[in-house]
């Protein structure tokens, strides 16, 4: 969630008991921030949209709990009560980790949920690229990403009051939390198309770029940039 990753088909058989997702077929990374972002061709109703993923994971956990109920207690009511108690803690645990992660991305010392949610709303309303925004924020150039910067200016003033004194250290810490490179969808398609034709160079190049996602390197500006404007939405498939 903190890097804009969308699994695509995050159902129960693609979620392991260890809490990890698997089977990355139609997965993709979000460009412009929008909680409703869906790429998978089979997700017609947006069940596994970016913003739904936390709730989907909780739902998957509930299905696991149902399968384990006989092991919790011989009394079915007691078993359900025990499972419900554990599952009820998911939302608070997720939100705590999300808030901590957003604080690191924003460079503030302590989580501020309102500050984080407000800037995400601005990004959605003004179609700002999710990954580029946070790197631009640490570089002091985020204002240029907004077509109407005044709301961002007001938000930035609130953030300014929460920043630690050592701004250079803040920027360095933010760059350790915010990737400059992600597997941009158009780059993935480029690599797939070339590999299909027997040319592995673009894949190896992309793999090298994203293997060090936080380290900005000269000559890789095209890999940090947004996807070209497309007339048709990007679609992924289970075979991808």
Residues of each region from the PLM?
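Regulatory N- and C-terminal appendages and interdomain linkers associated
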Residues: 39, 44-240
């Amino acid at each position: 969630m903190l890097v804009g990753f969308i699994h695509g088909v995050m159902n129960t058989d693609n979620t392991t008991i260890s809490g990890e997702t698997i089977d990355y077929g139609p997965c993709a990374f979000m460009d412009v921030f929008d909680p409703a972002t869906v790429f998978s061709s089979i997700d017609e109703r947006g069940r596994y949209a970016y913003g739904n993923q936390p709730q989907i994971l909780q739902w998957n956990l509930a299905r696991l709990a149902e399968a384990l109920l006989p092991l919790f207690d011989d009394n079915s009511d007691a078993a359900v009560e025990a499972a419900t108690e554990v599952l009820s803690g998911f939302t608070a645990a997720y939100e705590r980790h999300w808030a901590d992660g957003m604080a690191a991305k924003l460079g503030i010392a302590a989580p501020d949920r309102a500050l984080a949610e407000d800037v995400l709303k601005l990004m959605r309303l003004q179609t700002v690229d999710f990954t580029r925004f946070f790197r631009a924020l640490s570089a002091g150039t985020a204002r240029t990403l907004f077509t109407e910067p005044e709301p961002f200016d007001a938000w930035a003033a609130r953030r300014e009051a929460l920043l630690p004194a050592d701004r250079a250290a803040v920027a360095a810490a933010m760059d350790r939390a915010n990737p400059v490179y992600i597997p941009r969808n158009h780059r993935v398609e480029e690599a797939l198309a070339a590999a299909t034709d027997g040319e592995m160079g673009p894949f190896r190049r992309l793999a090298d770029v994203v293997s060090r996602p936080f380290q900005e390197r000269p000559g890789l500006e095209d890999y940090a940039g947004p996807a070209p404007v497309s007339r048709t939405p990007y679609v992924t498939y289970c075979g991808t």
